[in-house]
């Protein structure tokens, strides 16, 4: 039984921004098996024995995914998911469920969990789900970063440039925009060029995409 007396939390990376697999399970045997599996494929991971312990550690948004037992004493999996939602934490969650927990897993999916896997499961099956969840998290973070960059560029536009931007993305020609704003067509052309430069857009299509992102 000695191998199961592992620390409830194990940190395998010194970089808090490295993608990490967070594992929360009250079963020591499961934690030990998960730890061995993560080590075998060199996945950064941290292991917790309870939802409360995990929340105490996760004081900020970090990249990675969460592998979470749906049934635990104290703070259960669904309750932990609810708390993360309240905190605005978008960490992708994979729920580990028993045979009779499918309705709970469906509820978790409806609330934003990316996947669930039933016990017993094959190691490769879990690893595949984890890699998919990590890819999902990376895509979300890239989208959030892009949104923040676009918002920053928009803030640098003058009021007039923003007016021109909002009209340009509707597909209206410079002549029509000039008429609607009560300025010359040449003025619109100048503002349009400045908008393209400040927004770092190479084409009208780029501007339209940024407008949709904003």
Whereabouts are the PLM-identified features?
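Basic, Lys/Arg-enriched C-terminal extension of HTH/homeodomain DNA-binding domains
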Residues: 8, 193-214
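Non-catalytic signal-transmission and effector/linker regions of two-component phosphorelay proteins
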Residues: 1-22, 28, 35, 149, ...
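Active-site beta3 strand of CheY-like receiver
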Residues: 22, 61-67
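C-terminal output helix
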Residues: 101-103, 117, 121-130, 176, ...
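Acidic catalytic/metal-coordinating carboxylates
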Residues: 49-50, 75-80
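Active-site residues of response regulator receiver
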Residues: 69, 97
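Receiver (REC) domain active-site loop signature in two-component systems and cognate sites
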Residues: 72
